[in-house]
Amino acid sequence: MPKTIPIIIANRSILVKEKDNDKFVVFNMPGIKEEPNIPFYHQFAGKISECQYYFKEFMKDLYGKKVTKYVLAIIVPDDTTPLEHIFINEFFLHSDACKAVAQLTMGQTLSKSHTKYISLSRSCRNIILQYINNGEILAQKQYDINTYSTKQIAEDAKRLHIDIEYSGAPFFINNFNMNMDDFLDMGQVITTKEFLDKIANVQTEKV
């Protein structure tokens, strides 16, 4: 099995697991400004070669010159669009800092002990409700972060998928970004530390 480097694309930065422990360090690209409702990495497109160079040097500092033998297991926000998935894949793959790239959404990583569950998370633009079964996203609803109703989301969660209506499912609140105060009483809260511990042990065979 190829060696894996877990990477998290958070709301404002990229977190990379260190080589010899389970801690994560932040990769910040100089000159990137936060814009409302727009993932920060969109700005990489305007200076793609420069961003890829900085990332490659960052990874070489962490993992040495043999970093190209690793597979990057990239954990992305739950509302990542198909085009964003492609951009993320191409950006990292062509940074010359890895052997290959694999992606999972945050919601798909929340539980190894449950084959099916509901996840709720918050990105820079949406609240995302998902039903996960055997690692696959079978249903999803998104709500604008400026107009959502906690009551409506709670009701929607009960009928997000026919499986839930008949047999129920555990409900996980992903509080990795510490921005889920409105939802903490809806289910089991996954703290920042718990989430990082889960991702630190992600392997590409699971991605």
Predicted regions and their residues:
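Short N-terminal binding/cap micro-motifs at the start of the first secondary-structure element
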Residues: N11-E18, F24
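Nucleotide/phosphate-binding catalytic cleft detector across ATP-hydrolyzing
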Residues: M1-A10, V25, I32-C124, Y131-V207
